[in-house]
Amino acid sequence: GTGLFAYNADYLKQMQQLFRLDVHLVTEPELPDYADVRVMPWGWNPAIRKRMLKGGVLEKNLPTPDALDKYRMKAARSNALAFRALFYFNKIDYTCGDGCCLVEADGRMTDISPDIVDRYKEGCVFKSLWSGSGKGLCWCRHGFTKNVSDWCSRALKENRGFVMEPIFDKVEDFAMEFYSDGRGKLLFVGYSRFVTDDKGAYRGNILTSDEQVEEWIQQYVPFEAFVRIRNMMQKALETSYATSYMGFLGVDMMVCRQKEGHPYAINPHVEINLRMNMGIVSHVLSDHFIVPGGEGRFSIDCFPTHEALMERHEQDMQSYPLVVKDGRVVSGYLPLVPVTPKSRYRAFVCVTAAE
């Protein structure tokens, strides 16, 4: 509505003054004026395609329904299993992550029984084929309970399958980010580090540079091994996606403790996010909007009421005053979306000054 546009316009004006942004708002009624431009939503689905087409974007600039069907299949969590096999059979050092399988409702492992679950002495986790940001997970830490059984039954009924994997002894999360041009070339964009809760749900990103990530990872694995993992992943992704997908994609990874062999190893294929993702956002923020050497967090918070959000927003503005120099955040709290009297969520960064 008009009120929302006013808040967005005011917020954009403020950001333009702080960061010299060469951007402007486009409302839905204005879409016909941009009918021949490339549309880059966070991710694609039939509803977004229909909305863009109805709004006036030319059909030639939108993915076809058939392309969306193929995109959906390529975005399934089960695709990570092929990458697990690749790393396993090539015996890439300092990697882990085996013991995972796809459970399908076509006669192959359709009945998940306690005997199967008992293979995983430390517990296991079931993952929906389509979800993200730590959602669509069912943790099985204390045996095959009725709740777990019901979850598996629903997943088989709704999606015809799910992924089953052991619970790894995770130390930290990170990701490698890439861009596919859709014409055969897949480029490495950078790294991101993120934080999850004990149930695997996304809680935020650590704002840090690629150089800082490469320094951080060396406390766990040698840098040469890390580069080999990155190169192997880039080559595998290029083979799988570079001609059939255009856009950003991220591969979630984790550092894990090991009981045998090296003390630590990298699980390099936890999840493949075939879309724009929080890691890309945090990488862009670190590269272009945070002072070099600055560190902080990029987070998304939800609140039960807009009053609770407004109270916390005002408190953070006072506790962490924003300092911007030469178009980059030196320190402080910066909301990344307008916080209005009706808001119940916020996306923001909080940066600490570089020493």
For each feature predicted by the language model, list its residue ranges.
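Phosphate-binding site of ATP-dependent enzymes
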Residues: 148-203, 254-269, 277
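Peripheral (often C-terminal) accessory segments that flank ATP-dependent C-N-forming ligase machineries
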Residues: 291-355
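Glycine-rich phosphate-binding loop of ATP-grasp-fold ATP-dependent ligases
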Residues: 123-149, 175, 198-217
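ATP-dependent carboxylate/phosphate-activation module, predominantly the ATP-grasp catalytic core
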Residues: 178-235, 273-300
